[in-house]
């Protein structure tokens, strides 16, 4: 877990999947994602099992409020290239219909993700 002033990032949990799927299926969000199709729960489960649990080129995190542990979004490093030491960053805030918010949660999430990447992955 990486903790900031307002939020922290930690492992995506199986029980997070229905909420993440609802946010991901919003058309105004989906247009920005690599996966542009509407997801069903089976697709979301497959993503969790293949990418979150079993892919060494992906590190995904849930974004949660420090004070309530409420899930507010998701972020991760995708397509990690271990040779060239780089990756794509993925992040969205679903809470409060934000996508990328003005309260600074996305910015703080990026900082926490960068800290993870540089400290844990090199």
Model-derived features: positions:
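A short, well-structured alpha-helix characteristic of acyl/acetyltransferase catalytic modules
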Residues: 1-46
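Residue-level detection of beta-strand scaffold positions
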Residues: 12, 16, 58-60, 71, ...
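Amphipathic alpha-helical recognition patches that constitute DNA-binding helices
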Residues: 19, 88, 108
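Hydrophobic helix-cap positions at the C-terminus of alpha-helices
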Residues: 23, 51-54, 117
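Short, polar/flexible loop-turn hinges at active-site or ligand-entry regions and domain interfaces
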Residues: 31-33, 97-100
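Acetyl-CoA-dependent GNAT
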Residues: 42-98
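Conserved acetyl-CoA-binding loop-helix of GNAT-fold acetyltransferases
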Residues: 101-116
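Conserved GNAT acetyl-CoA-binding A-motif
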Residues: 119-122
